[in-house]
């Protein structure tokens, strides 16, 4: 029997949120009742984030304000535990390339060991976003490249400000 309220989480660092992320979030919002954009806040992560978790959540909230069933929320535990806490039935992830699939396949196996009741759903990136990574956006912005077609306007402005400091 399917749950009455179909909730999913879409996890990521979103440092910063890109139009590729927003494509996946928007598509998930059309398929599910509630989409929680789970913004990772993990102090032991190898790569430090450029923006604090609160600002990354705000970027997502601003970019998805037109989607009534989407909200951003920070998390700092296992994604399957966060999914359980929020009542999510599935974890939704975007896949860009074969390398994403290999990584996500391994993560899916670990997640299923921890929480077999939580499904993993994968949405393929469209060609327009198949190359897009937050790290690439930051690198482009660092060297003065044009990022206006890669991130929401508020994010582009804030990223340029942050990198000029």
What do the predicted segments below correspond to?
Residues 1-165:
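Nucleotidyltransferase catalytic core that binds NTPs
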């Amino acid at each position: 029997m399917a749950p009455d309220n179909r909730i999913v989480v879409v996890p990521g660092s979103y440092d910063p949120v890109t139009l590729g992320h927003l494509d996946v979030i928007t598509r998930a919002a059309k398929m599910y009742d509630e989409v929680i954009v789970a913004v990772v806040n993990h102090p032991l992560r190898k790569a430090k984030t450029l923006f604090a978790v609160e600002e990354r959540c705000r970027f997502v909230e601003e970019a998805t304000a037109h989607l009534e069933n989407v909200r951003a929320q920070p998390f700092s535990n296992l994604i399957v535990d966060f999914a359980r806490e929020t009542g999510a039935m599935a974890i939704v992830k975007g896949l860009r390339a074969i390398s994403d699939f290999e990584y996500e396949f391994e993560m899916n196996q670990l997640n299923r060991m921890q929480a077999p009741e939580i499904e993993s759903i994968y949405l393929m990136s469209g060609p327009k976003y198949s190359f897009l990574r937050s790290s690439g956006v930051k690198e482009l912005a660092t060297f003065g490249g044009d990022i206006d077609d890669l991130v929401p306007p508020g994010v582009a402005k804030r990223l340029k400000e942050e990198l000029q400091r």
